[in-house]
């Protein structure tokens, strides 16, 4: 069912919307973790390092695609909040057209150049072939991955955060079965893990679209809704492209970090891969809050209810404190989780993984700020600064690694993300409060 976030308690609306999104994010991480666990346990340390070494490259490309998809969802939330259902149907149709175009434009060059990208990232020779086998399949399935994110974004834009969860849970179990079959039985190696992932996401996307068009009359499109118009395309891409570029720019900085990790050899790569999985697991509440706040701000902006936006953001700030404390606790206690990903891990792997996790545990609050304020600004049609914040992230990582890698070694890896989060979080907080101050002045006479 739809959820109108322009009425009722802001805190209650945000939390109720967030719970299914959080469960969905956890399940998405879950089947990503299953890939990693099965690869590590059945294919060994080199295969685990190979899959892990592709993470930043995947984030660069899939982050761009999914950033555009999220932008489509924001525009849907604006139309839904304004109760303009004719425009809403056109945005749904336009989302499907643009998804097909963007997927095609991304798939061809990335599949062709995947090996060259991995070489540029200094991927160790002993895992290069395994990494390329994995990433080529992932890139070939961009359409399936992006389609699920578009369908989920549309449903969340009208306040339905439960339906994407149900189909994602189903596809998660499918992913586990396919992982075991393709890796253990068919013996496709790292490529088998990639096939399992994209097939599972494709099933989830298909079921989402079928349900969406059958269940919600306001989303049922007709032939007259499918056309490319300059105004509609501009509106969709003016939000989607900054969100996409933000993901990709951030990913470039992360790729530089991965390149620094790769210098230390496959054991450190495996340790960093496992530690990154713990980090991702511990921070799942943060993108969840970001998704909820983007929809909340988008609907209330469309409805012209600015006071609700201010109130919701205050509640979001306090939520950040609680979720950052929980994330820190998981990181500090992450040694047990690290053991899930590597068969018979050496003490060296544990040591490198925990060094990283203990360091980042002190900086979880700035990371939570990034998700809260970046998504709020995107939901408010202020996409430029969130995109520039990605540039700040990239530059910070480059500077930290360039200055500290030679004299301090692995400390460069440990410090790059925390320092980046601190500077980026402050930038986004300042930008949001400038917008709020201007908005309060502009709408001071409004009851909303």
Language model feature labels by segment:
Residues 21-74, 138-145, 234-299, 320-327, ...:
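Transmembrane helix-bundle signature of multi-pass secondary active exporters and lipid flippases
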Residues 19, 35, 72, 113-114, ...:
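Hydrophobic/aromatic residues in alpha-helical transmembrane segments
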Residues 69, 137-156, 164-172, 193-206, ...:
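Short runs within selected transmembrane alpha-helices of multi-pass transporters and secretion channels
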Residues 60, 175-180, 205-209, 281-284, ...:
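Hydrophobic transmembrane alpha-helices of multi-pass small-molecule transporters
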Residues 48-108, 145-164, 271-335, 367-389:
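Small-residue-rich hydrophobic transmembrane alpha-helices
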């Amino acid at each position: 069912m739809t959820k109108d976030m322009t009425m009722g308690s802001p805190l209650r609306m945000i939390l109720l919307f967030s719970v299914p999104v959080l469960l969905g994010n956890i399940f998405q991480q879950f089947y990503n973790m299953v890939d990693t666990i099965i690869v590590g346990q059945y294919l060994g340390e080199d295969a685990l390092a190979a899959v892990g070494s592709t993470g930043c490259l995947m984030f660069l490309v899939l982050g761009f695609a999914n950033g555009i998809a999220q932008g489509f969802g924001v525009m849907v939330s604006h139309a839904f909040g304004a109760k303009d259902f004719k425009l809403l149907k056109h945005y749904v149709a336009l989302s499907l057209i643009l998804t097909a175009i963007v997927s095609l434009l991304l798939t061809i060059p990335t599949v062709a150049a995947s090996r060259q990208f991995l070489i540029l990232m200094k991927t160790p020779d002993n895992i290069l072939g395994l990494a390329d086998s994995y990433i080529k399949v992932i890139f070939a399935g961009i359409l399936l991955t992006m389609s699920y994110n578009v369908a989920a974004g549309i449903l969340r834009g009208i306040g339905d955060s439960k339906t994407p969860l149900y189909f994602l849970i189903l596809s998660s179990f499918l992913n586990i079965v396919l992982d075991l079959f393709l890796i253990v039985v068919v013996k496709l190696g790292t490529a088998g893990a990639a096939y399992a992932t994209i097939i599972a996401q494709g099933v989830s996307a298909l079921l989402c679209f079928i349900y969406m068009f059958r269940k919600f009359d306001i989303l049922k499109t007709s032939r007259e809704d499918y056309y490319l118009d300059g105004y509609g395309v501009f509106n969709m891409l003016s939000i989607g492209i900054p969100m996409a570029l933000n993901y990709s720019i951030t990913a470039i900085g992360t790729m530089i970090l991965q390149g620094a990790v790769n210098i230390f050899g496959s054991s450190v790569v495996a340790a960093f891969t496992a530690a990154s999985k713990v980090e991702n697991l511990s921070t799942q509440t943060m993108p969840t809050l970001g998704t909820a706040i983007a929809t909340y701000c988008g609907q209330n902006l469309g409805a012209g209810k600015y006071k609700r936006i201010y109130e919701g953001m205050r509640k979001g700030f306090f939520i950040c404190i609680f979720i950052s404390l929980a994330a820190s606790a998981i990181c500090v206690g992450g040694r047990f989780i690290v053991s899930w990903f590597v068969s018979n891990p050496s003490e060296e792997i544990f040591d490198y993984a925990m060094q990283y996790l203990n360091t980042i545990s002190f900086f979880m609050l700035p990371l939570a700020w990034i998700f809260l304020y970046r998504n709020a600004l995107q939901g408010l049609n202020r996409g430029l600064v969130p995109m520039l914040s990605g540039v700040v992230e990239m530059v910070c990582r480059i500077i930290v690694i360039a200055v500290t890698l030679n004299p301090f070694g692995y400390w460069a890896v440990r410090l790059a993300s925390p320092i980046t989060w601190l500077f980026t979080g402050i930038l986004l907080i300042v930008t949001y409060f400038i917008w709020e101050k201007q908005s309060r002045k502009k709408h001071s006479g409004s009851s909303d």
